[in-house]
Amino acid sequence: MYPVDLHMHTVASTHAYSTLSDYIAQAKQKGIKLFAITDHGPDMEDAPHHWHFINMRIWPRVVDGVGILRGIEANIKNVDGEIDCSGKMFDSLDLIIAGFHEPVFAPHDKATNTQAMIATIASGNVHIISHPGNPKYEIDVKAVAEAAAKHQVALEINNSSFLHSRKGSEDNCREVAAAVRDAGGWVALGSDSHTAFTMGEFEECLKILDAVDFPPERILNVSPRRLLNFLESRGMAPIAEFADL
């Protein structure tokens, strides 16, 4: 098991079922050292208000030896790469994930989807693109992977895509992983947990990576320090409380 999980939702996204405390308890039980809460951006119908993200600044950094990153899974809004995260929200957040969600950006043709995703990557506002292998959104995988490598943005392999949602993602995700490998980019693994019980579960992701001989040194979840080094290289100030993770 990798000790870092970068994608999960709490009861603040009302189609999810666990609290921050639930995730901390599961992290201790499963040996997770660092995790990110990434509730849906406010343009989703059941997402928290933008004040929720601003007020994450009051969260403790470490509880019982487990580090907590303040994050968001923002929505890609248009072909210009705008996301529903702005202003003071950025000041409170450590990790910005962004992806396509049908209520905010309906599936378009391959060229339009690709344009929107690459514009988001190039914006400088995002660290990870969530579930880029979603079969509802055809993209130019090679072009996206090359843009992500250029701009130091990770592409996610999402465990939930193979179990609960986005059915038919396997072939696309293998293509994504191979393209990231060839471009020299990063992948991020996400459980996309909507209940704490699936936190840290990456078994299906690892099958995808194994199938393309993906280099472990380009997986962000291998250690807290690797992930933190990545975020710091993107401009995040070092977080003193995480020094011993």
Curated annotation (Swiss-Prot):
Cofactor: Zn(2+)
GO cellular component: cytosol
Chain positions recorded as Zn(2+) 3 binding sites: E73, H101, H131
Binding-site residues for Zn(2+) 2, renumbered to this chain: H15, H40, H194
UniProt record, GO biological process: bacterial-type flagellum-dependent swarming motility
Cofactor note as given: Binds 3 Zn(2+) ions per subunit.
Molecular function terms from GO: identical protein binding; phosphatase activity; phosphoric ester hydrolase activity; zinc ion binding
Keywords: Hydrolase, Metal-binding, Zinc
Regulation: Activity is stimulated by YcdY.
Knockout mutant characteristics: Mutants show no swarming ability.
Pfam families: PHP
Family the UniProt entry places it in: Belongs to the PHP family.
Assembly mode: Homotrimer. Interacts with YcdY.
Name of the protein this chain belongs to: Probable phosphatase YcdX
Source species of the chain: Escherichia coli (strain K12)
